């Protein structure tokens, strides 16, 4: 029994050991599987990371490639631009070289021609010396003197022709330059302008106001006329009073006086005198303000107060219907612009242009030229000699001392002669046209004449059988001279001679 039990127990122990062995084998198998899985997973990770690294490397390589290609393109463009500039410069240089070569060839040709001419002259001189010595039996010295005299005469003739050609070219260039300067000056000095009249019209609230202005037995109107120096015209024109006076200051004082009397309602000699005195003071202030505004407009820094005051009075003065202050400002602008174009003193030209007609305010007090009076007036108040000369010389009454004085005269002519700047009365205008045509018709060979362009051009039709082309040129000068001697007119008048020759034949 005990043996059986021992055998049984041993078997049990052996079975358990076999089971443990089997369990160990299972665990080993599992460990092998686990190890295999770990190895496979590690291999997968390695492959994945390798692919990732490869992808990043490819991306980096692509970026580097793009940057290199971009830099290459930029470099290529820069090189292309530089090549284009170089090609353009080469073309310009080629063109200049070609011009230089052409000029060189021309110079060589001219030198060759001159050399040929010298040879011809030398040959001719030798022949003439021989001929003169042979024919007249003159000495060599006498023959040489005759030959030199003849050559000198021929050269003088050639020089005269050359000088005339250069003079014509110079005249053309001067014309172009002067047109450019004048067009620039007029363009910069363009200004609005309204022609002034010698009468003022005051509108009345009703016709009853006419009686109040006239006053009992005309005392009010006589007081106004006596205090202001203005003719007060009251006629059948409804609700209107006309003031007539060539002195713009007096006319403006009278206008303001009557307007204030109408507004106030009290119209009697005492009130009229009070308002006239007040209006005169107001006008004096406006005169000074007008002078100061002119200086500001032209950027002129300062002047003597008396000059400014006298300058302001030009606002109320006209010449051929043109406001003198407006004209003076325009002349200053044109003169300064022309001075800037030719490199002269701009400030001097501007100052002289503004003051050139200041003497027109003073000519009623002193019987002499307004240019001389104006020059002496500004000299009294410290203006420089160059400005004084510009004022006094603008009508050729004294000699020009500076180029700016000449510019002031030219600017004055431009401002006065431009279309629309000045006007005349209808009667004087018609009479001037008639006189122009009468002067033209007084010459022999004139068939008809027409004053056109508001009297600024005179066209004359002549008989071609009686007047030749050369005589027509001479006639135009004679007509212009006669107009200058016998007529007074603003600006200039163009004289045009028309000569037409017709040949007519009939086919039968």
Swiss-Prot record:
Protein name: Ribonuclease Y
GO biological process, one term: mRNA catabolic process
Keywords associated with the record: Endonuclease, Hydrolase, Nuclease, RNA-binding
Role: Endoribonuclease that initiates mRNA decay.
GO MF annotations, alphabetized: RNA binding; RNA endonuclease activity
GO annotations of cellular component type: plasma membrane
Protein's UniProt keywords contain Hydrolase: yes
Top-level taxonomy: Bacteria, Fusobacteriati, Fusobacteriota, Fusobacteriia, Fusobacteriales
Record InterPro entries: HD/PDEase_dom, HD_domain, HDIG_dom, KH_dom, KH_dom_type_1, KH_dom_type_1_sf, Ribonuclease_Y, RNase_Y_N
PANTHER family in the cross-refs: RIBONUCLEASE Y
Enzyme Commission code(s) on record: 3.1.-.-
Matching NCBIfam families: HDIG, RNase_Y
HD domain boundaries: 324-417
Family assignment from sequence similarity: Belongs to the RNase Y family.
């Amino acid at each position: 029994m005990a043996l059986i039990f021992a055998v049984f127990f041993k078997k049990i122990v052996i079975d358990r050991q076999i089971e443990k062995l089997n369990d160990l084998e299972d665990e080993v198998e599992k460990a092998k599987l686990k190890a295999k899985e770990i190895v496979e997973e590690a291999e997968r990770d390695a492959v994945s990371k390798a692919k990732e690294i490869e992808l990043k490397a490819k991306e980096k390589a692509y970026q580097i490639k793009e940057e290199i290609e971009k830099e290459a393109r930029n470099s290529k463009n820069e090189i292309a631009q530089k090549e284009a500039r170089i090609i353009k410069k080469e073309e310009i240089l080629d063109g200049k070289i070609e011009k230089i070569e052409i000029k060189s060839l021309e110079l060589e040709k001219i030198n060759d021609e001159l050399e040929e001419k010298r040879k011809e002259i030398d040959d001719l001189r030798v022949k003439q010396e021989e001929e003169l010595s042979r024919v007249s039996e003159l000495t060599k010295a006498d023959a040489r003197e005759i030959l030199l005299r003849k050559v000198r005469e021929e050269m003088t003739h050639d020089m005269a022709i050359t000088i005339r050609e250069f003079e014509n070219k110079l005249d053309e260039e001067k014309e172009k330059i002067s047109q450019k300067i004048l067009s620039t000056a007029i363009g910069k000095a363009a200004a609005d302008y309204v022609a002034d009249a010698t009468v003022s019209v005051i509108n009345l609230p009703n016709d009853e106001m006419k009686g109040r202005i006239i006053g009992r037995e005309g005392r009010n109107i006589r007081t106004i006329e006596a205090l202001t120096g203005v003719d007060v015209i009251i006629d059948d024109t409804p609700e209107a009073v006309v003031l007539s006076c060539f002195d713009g200051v007096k006319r403006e004082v009278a206008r303001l006086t009557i307007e204030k009397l109408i507004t106030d309602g009290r119209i009697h000699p005492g009130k009229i005198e009070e308002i006239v005195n007040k209006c005169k003071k107001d006008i004096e202030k406006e005169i000074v303000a007008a002078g100061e505004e002119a200086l500001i407009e032209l950027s002129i820094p300062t002047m003597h107060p008396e000059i400014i005051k006298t300058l302001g009075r030009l606002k109320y003065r006209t010449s051929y219907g043109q406001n003198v202050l407006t004209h003076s400002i325009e002349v200053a602008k044109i003169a300064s612009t022309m001075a800037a174009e030719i490199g002269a003193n701009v400030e001097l030209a501007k100052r002289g242009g503004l003051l050139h007609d200041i003497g027109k305010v003073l000519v009623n007090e002193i019987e002499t030229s307004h240019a001389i009076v104006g020059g002496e007036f500004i000299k009294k108040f410290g203006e420089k000699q160059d400005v004084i000369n510009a004022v006094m010389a603008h009508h050729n009454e004294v000699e020009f001392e500076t180029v700016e004085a000449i510019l002031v005269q030219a600017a004055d002519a431009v401002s006065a002669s431009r279309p629309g700047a000045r006007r005349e009365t209808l009667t004087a205008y018609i009479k001037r046209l008639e006189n122009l045509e009468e002067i033209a018709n007084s010459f022999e060979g004139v068939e008809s004449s027409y004053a056109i362009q508001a009297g600024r051009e005179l066209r004359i039709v002549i008989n071609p059988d009686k007047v030749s082309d050369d005589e027509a040129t001479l006639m135009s000068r004679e007509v212009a001279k006669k107009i200058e001697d016998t007529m007074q007119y603003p600006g200039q008048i163009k004289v045009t001679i028309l000569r037409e020759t017709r040949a007519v034949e009939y086919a039968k």
